[in-house]
Amino acid sequence: MMRRALPSGPQRRLVLAALAGALLALLVAAPFAFADPLTPESGGGSQNAENIDRLYKITLYIGIAIFLIVEGTLLWALVRYRARRGAPEAAQIRGNTPLELGWTIGAALILVVLTVVTFIYLPDIENPPPSGPNGLRADQAQFASIDQPDPPRSGGPILRIEVNGQQFLWRYDYAGGDQLFTYHEMVVPTDTTVVLEVTATDVIHSWWIPKLGGKVDGVPGHVNETWFKVRAGREGIYTGQCAELCGAGHADMRARVRAVTPDEFESWAEETRANIQASGEELSEERKRRDASEGEEG
């Protein structure tokens, strides 16, 4: 019986260098799995973002444990049963019923655990909660709507905003029929549930601010809904990025939400509405002057 020769010195060093390089690559890549730009930060601005973050980390930690067990066992077997000079060729084993049952049942149990955990978190990720006591008041509800996927059990008004993606910016239209809208920056009150209707005008875009929840595609002719609720006391700027390649200006299509107190939101809404009305009146006057000028020339 022929025996397999051990790798020569240079070949052995090459194999060890390759293994060391692979291990180094894994160590270098590991921190990126926790990088803030890729996943919602722990303790984010909204409850659904925090639940997404928890579910992601549970799945990640289970995956890391499986990886370490499998790769550790593989490395142990490579060292423990490595070929030795003068040793006979190892016996060829075809199948091991206990081992095969073990890793099949083990994998099934892991899937069951992940499924159960997912369904525990999923309702709190999908269904918007009621607005809090410090949110938008009933007398400020001209922007609000209770027509939403899962109406709140109690609490204040729900703020509904249409998010319309366009190359290469976002337009935000507030419910209420008073033509309140903004570009680039969405302004919302804290402690108020905000339901978003995400769509697009031209191509597919994807609205994503990690601290406020998962990404949602904006598809022309179709509306996808999501929600977030910035807790009271967490006023500030929340930023994100269009997460769907949508053209040459995709990198500049950023999303921005400014969370303010309900009173500050009311003041901002009144000022913005007045500015829109003034701009409309100015445009109307300009059109009248242009039409009059064209009439005189005719």
PLM segments and residue spans:
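Alpha-helical transmembrane segments
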Residues: 56-81
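Non-transmembrane, membrane-proximal soluble domains of secreted or membrane proteins
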Residues: 33-58, 78-298
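N-terminal secretory/membrane targeting signals
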Residues: 1-35
